[in-house]
Curated annotation (Swiss-Prot):
Its cofactor is Fe(2+); Ni(2+). The keyword Amino-acid biosynthesis applies. This is Acireductone dioxygenase. One of its GO terms (cellular component) is nucleus. GO terms for biological process: L-methionine salvage from methylthioadenosine; methionine metabolic process. It is an enzyme of class 1 (oxidoreductase). It catalyses: 1,2-dihydroxy-5-(methylsulfanyl)pent-1-en-3-one + O2 = 4-methylsulfanyl-2-oxobutanoate + formate + 2 H(+); 1,2-dihydroxy-5-(methylsulfanyl)pent-1-en-3-one + O2 = 3-(methylsulfanyl)propanoate + CO + formate + 2 H(+).
Length: 175
């Protein structure tokens, strides 16, 4: 895992967009973002049990696996959105970027590769893309039935109950 400030320059979303300014993992924690490097399935199982994740599935994001809809899907994952549930991803193979909004509404880019697990709190604005290799295989963990419902950023999501709870939580974490 490597985290840094997104450079905001034009260009393919799958490029690194590295500003050269690193972000300390402690800052990610202040945003409510949790990171683990996991080397075995048993560690994933332990984390799932501890956090009450009951279901899981796997997704492969690649042109070979998704065919003609790959570019459309990658663009949809990159729309800024939030979820009303935690988003938990364990990278099984390949790599990709999660971008999360900072307290100042800037993007923090988090590069994840095989063995990295990230937990995004419900209500955080974020987006995802593969890196330039165009290949990410990930396990998705869920507390209940598997679902992935993005709520794209807008006035309505700014007032969303889960967004408001996240902002209160973030203020408490930063204190």
């Amino acid at each position: 895992m490597r985290a840094y400030w997104f450079d905001n320059l034009e260009g393919d979303q799958r490029q690194p967009h590295d500003s050269g300014r690193a972000v300390d993992p402690a800052y990610l924690s202040k945003l409510g973002v949790l990171y683990h490097h996991i080397s075995s399935q048993s560690e994933v199982d332990e984390l799932a049990k501890a956090r009450d994740y009951k279901n899981r599935d796997e997704i492969t994001v690649s042109p070979e696996k998704m065919g003609d809809i790959y570019e459309e899907k990658v663009k949809s994952f990159f729309h800024e959105h939030l979820h009303e549930d935690e988003e938990i991803r364990y990278i099984l193979d390949g790599a990709g970027y999660f971008d999360v909004r900072s307290e100042g509404d800037d993007w923090v880019r988090i590069w994840l590769e095989k063995g990295d697990l990230i937990i995004l709190p419900s209500g955080i604005y974020h987006r995802f893309t593969t890196d330039e290799q165009n290949y990410t295989k990930a396990m998705r963990l869920f507390k209940d039935e598997p679902k992935w419902t993005p709520l794209n950023r807008g006035e309505e999501t700014d007032e969303n109950q889960f967004r408001q709870e996240y902002l209160k939580l973030r203020q408490g974490l930063a204190a």
